[in-house]
Amino acid sequence: QNADTLVSCGGIQSNHCRAVAWAAARNGLSCMLALRGEKPVEVEGNLLLDRILGADVRFFSVEDFKNIQDIENTVVDELRRNGNRPYWIPMGGSNATGSLGYIQMIREAAAFPVSFDHLYVALGSGGTFAGVWLGCHHAGIQPRIHGIAVCDDRAYFVAEISRIQREFQEVYGMKVDFEGIGQAIDDRHVGVGYALNTPSELEQLVHFASCEGLVLDPVYTLKAFLGMVDHIRSGAVEKGQNLLFVHTGGHPGLFPKHSEFNKMFLFR
């Protein structure tokens, strides 16, 4: 691509944007990030890492983010006027190229000496789910895939995932079976909203970490995990079946929640 600057967008605590900033620094490239929301008073969590990694950060309103194309045009045009060669990565890395990493992940999982009956993954922008679906198709394994939405609804994700998979088919020439995507998406666990948690949800995060030594992040994996637990309790998962839970990281997202955790621990 002959680019010298990586450009992407997302929420202020975007794990994807932090990964883009890291990739840019690691490969000697510049980085510009367009983040959704007002400039915060404190620089913490993923935003702190963005800045430490040298990213040029710009803030756009929630209203602006309703048209991502305008944001892309704004930042890319500015960089080009300044003599840079930008490479735009869509929000969440959710496109055909971004799916490749999860296809590889599924290939590795398929080599485990155990087969999986169910696979659980968080749904934020659709790229991870699309890659997992494509990976299972490519690897010839057939677990029942569950995408637990952390924002938006089933109709939104069906459209986004189908778009990514069509793009993958066009770019890489691999035929994909789209049947059943809608039934695989569970949008009942968004809760009070994207990146927002109830005290009960955070209590369950703490309980699971203290019992298992595995820390979830409050935005994505916590809600996916709670969705999985709900399926187990409701009988949707049968006793003795094997489950694969995809942990997508995101631990820096815990730190902007420090005031909520403080309240929890102070009153224990």
Feature locations, PLM:
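Alpha-helix C-terminal capping segments
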Residues: Q1-N2, A19-S30, W133-G140, G227-A236
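Small/polar-residue-rich loop-to-helix segments that shape phosphate-bearing ligand pockets
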Residues: G37-P113, I181-Q204
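Glycine-rich phosphate/pyrophosphate-binding loop at beta-loop-alpha junctions
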Residues: S99-A184, V246-R268
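Active-site-adjacent helical/loop segments in soluble small-molecule enzymes
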Residues: I181-K239
